[in-house]
């Protein structure tokens, strides 16, 4: 019986790692070195840390999982996840843990397989826009934006990777009058 429990634990660990590897926020943080020169090692460590967190805390609420993942992303990768994916990943991990607790290795294998089939490769490419603030000084301020594109990672699937869409294009762009002379950007509250 202990062998079956160990097998399910291994499947749970693999499912957790698959979910984290497919998480676009973590992919971007690793690819752009937000965690420093050891970003890839931190991402691998993150899988084990999340697995251990679930094992040590048997009855976790969704908010606790979100807080834990958000804290790890902030401390290890200097990244605040604001794309709405944190609750989705947390829910997915919580479902995996429930399957682990029931000893349902088949469900864990199925979830891992589905994640690997749908896995998208996300890349962030910088877009540079420049605005002259003072013609006499020839001083140019630039605002760097990131364009996120999703490409299939070679998996054979007919599904299309969803592109993140801004909720309101007018609120997402930095208006010219919001950039003042000294390079600061004025942030306005939504109305």
UniProtKB/Swiss-Prot annotation:
Superkingdom of the source species: Eukaryota
Spans annotated as Disordered: 140-175
Keyword rRNA processing: yes
A biological process from GO: rRNA processing
Family classification: Belongs to the TSR2 family.
Protein role: May be involved in 20S pre-rRNA processing.
Protein name (database record): Pre-rRNA-processing protein TSR2 homolog
């Amino acid at each position: 019986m202990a062998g079956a429990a160990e097998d399910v634990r291994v499947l749970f660990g693999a499912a957790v790692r698959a979910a984290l590897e497919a998480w676009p926020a973590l992919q971007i943080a690793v690819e752009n070195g937000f965690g420093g020169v050891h970003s890839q090692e931190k991402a691998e460590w993150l899988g084990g840390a999340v697995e251990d967190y679930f094992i040590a805390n048997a009855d976790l609420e969704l908010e606790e999982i979100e807080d834990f993942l958000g804290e790890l992303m902030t401390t290890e990768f200097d990244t605040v996840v604001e794309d709405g994916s944190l609750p989705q990943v947390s829910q997915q991990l919580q479902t995996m843990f429930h399957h682990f607790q029931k000893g349902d290795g088949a469900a864990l294998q199925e979830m891992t397989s589905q994640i690997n089939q749908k896995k998208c490769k996300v890349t962030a490419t910088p877009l540079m826009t420049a605005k002259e603030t003072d013609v006499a000084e020839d001083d140019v301020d630039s605002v760097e934006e990131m364009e996120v594109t999703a490409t299939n990672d070679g998996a054979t699937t007919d599904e299309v990777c969803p592109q993140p869409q801004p909720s309101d294009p007018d609120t997402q762009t930095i208006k010219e009058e919001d950039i003042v002379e000294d390079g600061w950007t004025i942030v306005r509250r939504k109305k």
